[in-house]
Amino acid sequence: MSSFIPLNFLEDTVSKKDLEEEHTRELQVEQAYKLFQSALKLQKQKQYESAYKVYEELFKLDIVSNHYFEELDFIRGLQDGSQNTDTDELTLLSPNVKSLRYLIFRNRGFLYLDMLKSNTENKSAEKVKEMFYPLLDDFCIALLYNEPDEKLLETLHEIFSYIGSERLSRFVLEYSLTSRKESDDLSGLLPIDQTVLSQYKTMLEHLSSGKFPKLDLKHLSFLEPIRLDIFAQQEKLASKKVAVIKSTSTKWVDLLDAINIHLKENQDESKIEDANRPRIRIFEPYVLTEEPLDIVRIEFTKRGVAVPATETEVTKAQPEQIVQERKPEEDNRVQRSSKRLSKVEDEIPAVTLESSHFLNMDYFRNQMNETIPNFEIFDVCSTYVEDGSGAQYIKDFKNIVSDWNDSYARAILSYDTAKSEDDNLKLLDLLSGYGKSEELKEKNIPPLGEIDIEFPELNYVEFKTYIIKHLLSKILTTKWSDKLYEKFTEWIVQFEGYIINDIDVESAIGVLEVLVDISTSLESQIKDSINNKLNKAVVNSMCQDLLRIKDKIIRWINYIETFPINDLQVASRFKWCQIIKEKAETKSWTENHPVKHKLQKLLGDAHFKINYPNYKNFIDFSKDSINSQLTIISVLAIFWRILSTSSTEDNKEAIRLLEDILLDSNTEPSDAILSIRNFLKQGSIDMKLSLWNILLSFYQSSNSGDKLTVGFEECVLFLNDYLVNEYVLLDEESRLVTLSRILGFYGSSISFVVTSLASTNWILMHPIKVQTLRLFFELSLLFEINEEASYISSLATSIKSKSTKSYHHLTNTLIKTIILILASIQKSNPQILHSVIRLFHTQLGLIGICGHAGGSFLEIAQEYLKSLPNSDQDICQIIKCKYHYSISIDGVVPADHGTARLDELNKNDCKELASFVLPLCFSKGGSTLNNVPKHDIKLLIDEIYDVIGDPDFDSNEALGRNKATLNYFLDNTRLTKRLFQEAFHGLVRLELGEAEEDKQFNGLYYIEGLLLFSSYKLRKKNMQSRAVELESAISLFENDIICGSNRFESWFLLGQSYGYLVEDDLIWTADKLTASDRKITTANLQRKSLICYLMAINKSLDESIKDVIKPVVGNLMSLFAKEMFSAVCEPMSMHAFKVQSHPRFINRVNGALFEPVSQFPAVDKTVCLKIIQQSLQLSIKSSCREWSDYYYLAKVQRKLDKPAGLVMETMASACRSAFKNKHADNIIEPHYNLVSFALKYVKSNRLDSKDALKYLIEDPLIKLEVGEETDFIKLIIKALNKIDSSDKKNWQHKAKYRLARLMQEEYHDVKGAIDQMSSFISLKTPNKALVSIWKPEPERPGKHFLYTFQYIHFYIELLKEIDDLDSLVAMLPKLRRSNSVMINLSIAWEILCSSVCKIIRESYGIGDNFEFTENLINTLPYQTFAANVKLLPDMMRRQSVPENLKSVLCFLFTVNDIKKLNNGYGPTSFIDDTLVTLYFMIYLNYFEKSSTEVTTDSPGLKKKIAKRDIFPLTNDILKAFKKDIEDVTKQKSYNELITAQKLKQGLNEDKSLENVPASANVNEIIVIDDDDDDNLSQEPATKKSKTESNS
């Protein structure tokens, strides 16, 4: 088999599964055949029980046991015939499986037959039955799978003949004769079996004579029990079945119940399963019974006899039942939550409610009455708790809320605007149904009496027909109970098909009336179900029922029309029924509707009256009712014109008609309008409410806000009047439902007004009197009191727990009423408006609903409060409720009112918030720099910025130009003297265009940047800051400027932000300070920082923002001066004055080139220092007396060579100011500089020592005690020690360094100086850092890298001075790795390497020049040297290394390591010469004589030794004598070896105590001045020693 698999091959998991199933099926077929063969073998051996067990095993296999449902589908398919569209699985079975099943069923049948034949004497009749019927089943099932063989057919023919089943016997013969012709097998080619044909002919001859042929079937005598059983069953079926139905009373309803129950008890369950379930409703129950009811007898029993309660299979669904059965999911959730909370509710005590329980509401009512003139709300608290108090509608409303039910919920939600657009058509339903109500029907109709007739013994169909005819004769003359009528209509629907051809015309009309009544009710239920959004399956089922009923109606109309009707009343009754049917089905009405003509035609014959006391949808027939219907049709035609409007013009016409009807706007109304008005006076309140609802909705859809307001006010006035007057006349039940509908209508109508009000920015177009709204406002307050009471006492029940939708409707009604009250008083006294808003919000917040109704109350309150003074706290409360951001003002924190949070803000929300929050950020007095918004506002600003995002520079050309202008200005502006002059005189102009941005967001980018910048500074104190935060802040400040603000604060903070970026570049690593070109990026940042500071200074001269500038100008000048000082001095060294972002193309003498850095700064350093001095003086003058300002001013004054006294006085001021600082313990710098300046001025003779000491004595930290000490240096050391001991955090290092310098320079105490420096310089291996110094907060960024270089340089010189070679060698690897912690590492490295080499050379008396090696190389013949060096290692091993060479080997090892560390880094000549010198010392020890021999050079040979030839030789020696070197270094240190060697040379042992001038080429010690001299990081200068050098 090929192993090739295509690349595009995809494994089909479904096919794979099918293959697996097929494989399993094949295995089962194989297993089944084996078992079948085994069973067949046992069957032949007459081991019947064993064979039966094998068959049982066979039927456990899936391939066999799954036969039932396949066969059932196959049989049903045959029964359905052409209507069958499903493919049954039986036809898809493989031939193997079909053959297998055929054999199994056939042979198991014969097994049963054999078992019956054997031992028949011991088998009971029941046992025979148990085996015979499975036998027949198996034979019959076998016929489904294959064509039967002759034996099977013959056996079936004999069995059927024996048991007397003539039809089945004949069927078998006919099947035998026709099966071959119909078969597709080869057997179809065989001729007909003559024996079977002969038997069939004989049977036909006997049947023609009325007799069935007798066959000799004695061999089947064992089936005699079966034959007898079948005969008994047939006799039983032939006898008549008498059904005795017992009724509990002689009432018709109980009789119908009894008949229904009897039928249900005798129904066949299998028939019910087979029947189509949805059709059971219209099924006659008798069809589903097991046995026929040939005779029906009725027996009346007394009450108490155990008769099952009436329960029909399917009752007609009533609207209330449907609502209860099919509630929406939301209502179900409410019920579930109510169940969960039932325990909590049970725990609420049954407290008797009193007015004192509602003090908040009472306070609110009193305040409202005091605040709003003439509002006068009644005492709602007392009214609620006192029974029987208040007007009728008040009492009824209390009853409604205390005993809430579904009918109130349906009524109050009937005008819910969320329903479908077809709701307006309810008005047509109301009008078209006018007259159906009970009050318009005849009252004096006698009730249907008890059963007064005898029932003949009839079969079921005749019996039921008899009852229906009798009841139809009384349906118009007697009044029935609803239950009886309901059961009777059910009978008519189920049974009408049996009586349609056996009934008189009058009864037929009665059946038609019942069907029309059912159809009309069902159509109304379907409409309600659709509007109530019930389950689609329920609606579909009702629609199917309606279609069936309509089919029945058509059939009955056709049937009745076949009768000649001569009786006028009967004919009128038939026509009236048809008119009612057509009217109910009419969807559109016109003036010339066919129904109208039919009514007019019928009017002439209406000289009598027909009552319809039982039909729900029939109006009594009379001349008055016909006239009423004609009027209603005329009204419907007009209303149809109103409701069917589609265009604006039609809409106007509809509005005009409604205004004429409802508002009496036409002084001369037409007759039609007058008739409608009269009609409405007689009609129910529902019609008027529907008309008002339509008018108001038209106003809203046509955006007629003023008309909507007027119409609403007129409508509310009408409702107020109605509730006080006409409402009282209604009965109690009608009142409660009517009041609920009025509240629902009011809530819907006020929603129209509030929606319109929102579209006009909450300005009411037409004023509404507040008193008009009082009645419904009071009802709403009663509702809220009831809700509050439900939390206090279990005697009160919350509507929310029973109907969430109703609760929200009433809550929203309260809020919208409040909105209209606010809109009505909006133009009154602002103080009243403010007080009312606060009252409403407090009260609504207490009950947690201020955010309901879509937040409309919060919207209108926010809009009105914008223009009211002193409303910030109220607006903050609205923001808390609306957006859940808590903003506190003056310590007042908004309360949590439990409102729902918005999912996320959108741009419109942000506009609203920004219009309040951004001005609030700028309104807190002074500059925002000193009043940074708090955390609560920060969260909100962040959210707004996230939604708004950065400006869209691509789509907004003005913004794009502004951005390019700003970037060009920052990138290309150089720090020139002219720029400084113009900035300090306010003359710099940056021309930015006016951007078209939303004014609401003016300042957003600045505030967001300010918050980000403040966060960075806070994190910076905790060492958690990130540069990315600064970059984001810079972008935001630039966006603020780009949008045209030219804001002083943005420039100021931009300067600080860029300054912090400079600090971030300089503070962590010295990488950007090691070379001039590496400083360019940092210098550009510093240049931008200074430019932004200058722009802020330029803007600070604007008189319009003088109040904002004044508090921060000192800080501005201080920060600018410090940033500029940092730019002028080391380590930046005026670099910011030389660079710009883009290199300039310069034409030099040596050619044109791009120059990133100018050779000379654009401003002289002295000018810069004077600007810094002036800025610091301005800062100090502005009362910003920061110690660092004095500190930097003193440094600048010293650099400008100001008098020593002035400098010292300024620094003393810095010391005094620092000592008063709350962090005085950490501020050491000014005190140290005071000592340092005193020392330098005294040594330079610019200040008398007494004057200098005076400053130190008066310093609050040093407090120098002079005593009798006269040595100025010792007093300075004492002051320095005092400063050092004051450093609690051990951050300061300059005092220690100065002490070390004084010890070395003044007292030649080198070891003491080394001890001082060792406090922060560590040569120990565990300490990875060579120098451990920290940057104190006041120290300029990058300065500590200069100090590190200075200290290392000084430390090396100290170690060299005492020949401490061990320490110097230990310093080598650490210093080599110190590139990131210091500047000028190469210089320090060169000094260290040269110092090690010098100490070694000096110990052997070799100077710093290269005379020794040069002389030797020039005199030593190369051939001799080459020959000797090959012998040198062996000679050293053979003769052993002498003592005088062991130290040379150790030094050679050290210098070789230095050479490796120095490779590719520093100068090498001095190190190489030292290495060669040491090697030649070893060489000369063995070949001293040969080195002076003179040889003749041969042509072509190398003549001179090169130093590089020596390096491999040194490596060879070091490798060969590595162990010897290790032994020596373990026994002696390098210092001991140096000391021993110098003793040999006759030098003084204690060199450290002798004042020896520096030898030639010794590097001068670099001193970094504490006031930032300019030559700090330059390469050290050298000077010649005054002593003579040794040759």
UniProtKB/Swiss-Prot annotation:
GO terms for biological process: chromatin organization; chromosome segregation; filamentous growth; hyphal growth; positive regulation of filamentous growth. InterPro entries: Hir3/CABIN1. One of its GO terms (cellular component) is nucleus. The keyword Glycosyltransferase does not apply. Residues 316-340, 1569-1591 are annotated as: Disordered. It is found in: Nucleus. Residues 323-334, 1581-1591 have a biased composition (Basic and acidic residues). Keywords: Chromosome partition, Nucleus, Transcription, Transcription regulation. Has a role in a nucleosome assembly pathway that is required for the integrity of heterochromatin and proper chromosome segregation. Belongs to the HIR3 family. This is Histone transcription regulator 3 homolog. It comes from Candida albicans (strain SC5314 / ATCC MYA-2876).
